[in-house]
């Protein structure tokens, strides 16, 4: 059983092994898509294959769509060359259900895959052709939050971006430069309308994409390298829109135990590929069943009825409320709390942590008691039900190979949003008192303890990558387990850093509690477990 056109001709073998197959004539759909593309997606990674591609497959199966997707990869061209093309753009989606069953689907909704490579004339010309098509309604993106960043740490354009600004839209090298070049092709083809839709997991994602594209339009026009009407085109929402979205589906990297299941079924050539850019890709993707995609309904060239596939279309204000609900209260803070303490207590699976009564109570209190009183209710999703699903279905799912180490990545960049917003809301509400927050400060103290790089048994571990790791770790570098130290003096410089926490913890008076907790957490080996048990009892 090979995952390609030839291998899938043997439908009976696949179906007998329990795989759901595409229920449409792929050749016909591919021909229609090539002629009249309606949706191109940038970022051929796991979330796209597990979510957007599968939604389109469902709609093709039901006859609600007659065309499929085009996907372009601009960060790592080897994904297209080594994964998409050998498998004729098929992939296997393994849905990991909380009850222990797995659902296996061969997803065939991607009809064409291209490298977003301006040095490859054939592929870049084809992308320009797609972008010039009247039929194209939307370009969507999962390129990670940093994919939209054009600036270096000194605030000036990164070298590739600066070079593109000076050279114009012909052969840009930077990711967004290449996308802006394609949009310029659409402009030149008659200022055709399009929705440019970021589906990355960051708040106000549409604004991030808009700012990046607009910077190129302004730069090229200013330098006399593009028609001056291009800038107005990009800035006119009736022509080019940048809707906000909220996406939520946990898609860990392809797991070896899932690979074994597929091998036993008789699927061949499943070996994952690690590209020269260190991207880890496999012909299959594993993901949780739960998924949410809420989209601001602003599509100047129309859109397909994706609500039939479970996507929610609404106003920008509602997208913002859903995003805040998830990121500031109902999911992300709980994930970070488990990530920090999971690493300290030696866990390798987030799901296993929910069997620890102290950790379970920690996230229940942070979610229901500390977070819910200030949650923003978006109306289209109920915050309490959302937390119920997170704590009872999603996080405890034993078949989700998600790790605290993965989630602990970049924690310094996440604390301000995931906890700082709740603290600000408490500080602003006359009926609430910041002093009533007891376990959010325990997470802060836990992160400072984590920065020591020593687990609760006294063994060294390597903290996950984080741009502030060296700086933040330096504040606790002299703290040793079981040795006396002045917590307030040691931690004051970092606790007053509002960039990290979203607020100045010293000014709010929360520093005392964080310091007290930190002193207890560093009392010796076993102190982390003991402190958690004490404050969650």
Indicate where each model-derived feature is located:
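Substrate/ligand-engaging "lid" and interaction regions
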Residues: 1-42, 46-537
């Amino acid at each position: 059983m090979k995952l390609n056109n030839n291998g899938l001709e043997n439908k009976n073998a696949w179906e007998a092994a329990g795989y759901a197959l595409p229920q449409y004539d792929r050749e016909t759909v591919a021909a229609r898509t090539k002629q009249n593309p309606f949706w191109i997606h940038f970022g051929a990674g796991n979330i796209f294959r597990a979510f957007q591609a599968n939604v389109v497959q469902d709609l093709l199966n039901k006859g609600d769509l007659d065309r499929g997707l085009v996907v372009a990869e601009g960060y790592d061209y080897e994904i297209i060359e080594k994964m998409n093309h050998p498998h004729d753009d098929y992939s296997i989606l393994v849905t990991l259900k909380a009850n222990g069953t797995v659902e296996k689907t061969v997803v065939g909704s991607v009809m064409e895959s291209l490298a977003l490579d301006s040095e490859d004339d054939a592929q870049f010309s084809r992308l320009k052709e797609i972008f010039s098509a009247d039929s194209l309604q939307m370009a969507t993106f999962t390129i990670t939050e940093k994919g939209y960043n054009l600036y270096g740490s000194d605030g000036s354009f990164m070298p590739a971006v600066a070079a593109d600004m000076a050279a114009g839209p012909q052969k840009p090298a930077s990711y967004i430069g290449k996308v802006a070049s394609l949009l310029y092709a659409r402009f030149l083809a008659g200022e055709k309308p399009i929705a440019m839709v970021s589906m990355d997991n960051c708040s106000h994602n549409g604004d991030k994409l808009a700012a990046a594209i607009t910077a190129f339009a302004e730069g090229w026009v200013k330098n006399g390298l593009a028609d001056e009407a291009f800038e107005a085109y990009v800035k006119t929402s009736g022509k080019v829109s940048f809707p906000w979205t909220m996406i939520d589906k946990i898609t860990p990297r392809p797991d070896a135990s899932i690979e074994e299941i597929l091998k036993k079924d008789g699927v061949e050539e499943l070996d994952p590929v690690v590209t020269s850019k260190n991207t880890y890709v496999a012909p299959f993707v594993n993901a949780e069943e739960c998924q949410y995609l809420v989209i601001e309904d602003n599509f100047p060239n129309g859109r397909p009825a994706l609500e039939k596939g479970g996507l929610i279309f609404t106003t920008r204000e509602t997208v913002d409320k859903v995003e805040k609900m998830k990121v500031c209260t109902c999911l992300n803070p709980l994930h970070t709390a488990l990530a920090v303490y999971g690493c300290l207590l030696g866990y390798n699976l987030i799901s296993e942590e929910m069997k620890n009564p102290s950790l379970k109570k920690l996230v229940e209190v942070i979610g229901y008691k500390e977070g819910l009183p200030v949650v923003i209710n978006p109306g289209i999703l109920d915050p309490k039900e959302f937390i119920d699903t997170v704590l009872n279905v999603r996080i405890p799912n034993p078949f989700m190979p998600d790790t605290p180490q993965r989630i602990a990545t970049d924690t310094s960049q996440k604390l301000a949003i995931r906890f700082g917003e709740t603290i600000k809301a408490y500080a602003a509400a006359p009926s609430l008192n910041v002093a009533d927050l007891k376990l959010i400060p325990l997470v802060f103290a836990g992160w400072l303890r984590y920065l020591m790089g020593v687990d609760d048994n006294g063994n060294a571990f390597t903290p996950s990558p984080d741009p502030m790791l060296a700086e933040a770790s330096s504040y606790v570098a002299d703290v040793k387990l079981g040795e006396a130290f002045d917590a307030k003096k040691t931690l004051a410089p970092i606790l007053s850093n509002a960039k990290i926490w979203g607020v100045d913890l010293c000014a709010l008076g929360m520093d005392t509690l964080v310091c007290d907790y930190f002193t207890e957490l560093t009392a010796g080996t076993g102190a982390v477990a003991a402190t958690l048990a004490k404050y969650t009892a």
